[in-house]
């Protein structure tokens, strides 16, 4: 019987399935950070247990770490305690850990693939909703809660219910200036933030196959924003070439056997999906979110929607509330929206490809006078090193953009990087909820190139026109 990629990944990790469908799944890789792990380790201690499989765990501090000079440590006492607790747990249990001063440190969903800790065919979990990122490698990857973090530490398994399967098929050549971020925002704009609820999404089609691994990670990263449990992309040569030679990748005959298996990680011809959604890449334009949900998004040449034209009363009410919070009026051209800050970073868009795209836009230009701050936060110390070897840091600095240390930063404002009330930000992150980047802050989700262009012009602009 023809199987989907999701079927294959699920079935290969089933330990036991109960009469009600509840399944014990084996977990290959467990990623941990400082925010959702302290209570899990405390539970482990109280029960007198130790991690079942030490080598399956990889820990890093990312949410609370400062992106400015780290010589003086972390100023905020709560943030400092979380990171110190992570340090202590890593040492007590002998788990692999990239501390704040380790050059391999970075955002957990950047360092996993970078180190080869994420490999095709794995089940990958983390106490973080954007764990779906790792599905780009043909993995079954999703976020878990703190109690589940403890369960995985103790048993290397997870209780789960199988989701339905959705196929998002994107075909055609991607227009100039349109990126993976624009694809996934367009998908969410089409199906809504609840469109993927109850599903695991496979992203496929000629457009997806043409993307780099960085682009595929961007798309899978935001599968959760469509409501999906997981997002994934089939394995191909691009996948295999990316993981080859990574520190934790197999070598020698183990590599050969792994590749043979990895090449089976695709949906079979004739495999049945519960829902199929199609997009024509040629019709996708650079996207800009205007509201307080990722589904509130339009093309850069569009206008802020008018709630009066929305027939669904619930959606209309949400739109009206979003416009009030965002201080926008219906029918305002997107290109008339002025910004105060720019944030280029996050687990969505902080990899080397993202930084190159942003640098290409700002090269030889300078930040607009009304933009108070434009910051670039690499996804890891290794991404930062590579960018500096390529001279990208100098391009950003010359354009008036700040070059920072790696971390989650302004994506969720748990460290000192945040918006002040009323400030408006062009952000390459994944969530534009109320207060996400700071109390009263207003977030617009865009691609790295679009964020860079807004920083130069002081308002949203079609990056395709700016390039020319």
Curated annotation (Swiss-Prot):
Cofactors (names): [4Fe-4S] cluster
Annotated InterPro entries: 3-IsopropMal_deHydase_lsu, Acnase/IPM_dHydase_lsu_aba_1/3, Acoase/IPM_deHydtase_lsu_aba, Aconitase_4Fe-4S_BS, Aconitase_4Fe-4S_dom, IPM_dehydratase_rel_enz, IPMI_cat
Binding positions for [4Fe-4S] cluster per the UniProt entry: 347, 408, 411
CDD domains given in the database record: IPMI (cd01583)
GO molecular function: 3-isopropylmalate dehydratase activity; 4 iron, 4 sulfur cluster binding; metal ion binding
EC number: 4.2.1.33
Family: Belongs to the aconitase/IPM isomerase family. LeuC type 1 subfamily.
PANTHER family: 3-ISOPROPYLMALATE DEHYDRATASE, HOMOACONITASE, MITOCHONDRIAL-RELATED
Stated name of the protein: 3-isopropylmalate dehydratase large subunit
Provenance organism: Janthinobacterium sp. (strain Marseille)
């Amino acid at each position: 019987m023809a199987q989907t990629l999701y079927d294959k990944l699920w079935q290969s990790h089933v330990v036991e399935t109960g009469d009600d469908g509840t399944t014990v799944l084996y977990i290959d890789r467990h990623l941990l950070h400082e925010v959702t792990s302290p209570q899990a380790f405390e539970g482990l201690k109280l029960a007198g247990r130790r991690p079942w499989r030490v080598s399956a765990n990889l820990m890093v501090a990312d949410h609370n770490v400062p992106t400015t000079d780290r010589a003086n440590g972390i100023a905020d006492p709560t943030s400092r305690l979380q990171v110190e607790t992570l340090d202590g747990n890593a040492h007590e249990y002998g788990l692999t850990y990239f501390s704040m001063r380790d050059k391999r440190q970075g955002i957990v969903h950047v360092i996993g693939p970078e180190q080869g800790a994420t490999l095709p065919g794995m089940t990958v979990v983390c106490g973080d909703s954007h764990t779906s990122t790792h599905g780009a490698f043909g993995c079954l990857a999703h976020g878990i809660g703190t109690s589940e973090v403890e369960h995985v530490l103790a048993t290397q398994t997870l209780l789960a219910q199988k989701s339905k399967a959705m196929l998002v098929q994107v075909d055609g050549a991607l227009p100039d200036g349109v990126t993976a971020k624009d694809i996934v925002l367009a998908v969410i704009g089409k199906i809504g933030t609840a469109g993927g609820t109850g599903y695991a999404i496979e992203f496929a089609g000629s457009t997806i196959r043409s993307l780099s691994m960085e682009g595929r990670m961007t798309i899978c990263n935001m599968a959760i924003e469509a409501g999906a449990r997981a997002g994934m992309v089939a394995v191909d040569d691009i996948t295999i070439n990316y993981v080859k030679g990574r520190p934790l990748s197999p070598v020698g005959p183990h590599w050969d056997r792994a590749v043979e298996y990895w090449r089976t990680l695709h949906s079979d011809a004739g495999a049945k999906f519960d829902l199929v959604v199609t997009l024509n890449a040629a019709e996708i334009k650079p996207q800009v979110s205007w509201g307080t949900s990722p589904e509130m998004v339009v093309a850069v040449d569009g206008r802020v929607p008018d709630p009066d034209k929305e027939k669904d009363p619930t959606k209309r009410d949400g739109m009206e509330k979003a416009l009030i919070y965002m201080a926008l009026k219906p029918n305002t051209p997107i290109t008339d929206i002025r910004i105060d800050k720019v944030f280029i970073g996050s687990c969505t868009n902080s990899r080397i490809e993202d930084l190159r795209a942003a640098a290409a836009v700002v090269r030889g230009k300078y930040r607009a006078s009304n933009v108070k701050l434009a910051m670039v936060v690499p996804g890891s110390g290794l991404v930062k090193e590579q960018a500096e070897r390529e001279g990208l840091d100098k391009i950003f600095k010359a354009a008036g953009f700040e070059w920072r240390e790696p971390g989650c930063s302004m994506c969720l404002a748990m460290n000192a990087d945040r918006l002040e009330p009323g400030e408006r930000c062009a952000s390459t992150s994944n969530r534009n909820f109320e207060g996400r980047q700071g109390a009263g802050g207003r977030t617009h989700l865009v691609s790295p190139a679009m964020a860079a262009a807004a920083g130069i012009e002081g308002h949203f602009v079609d990056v395709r026109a700016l390039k020319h």
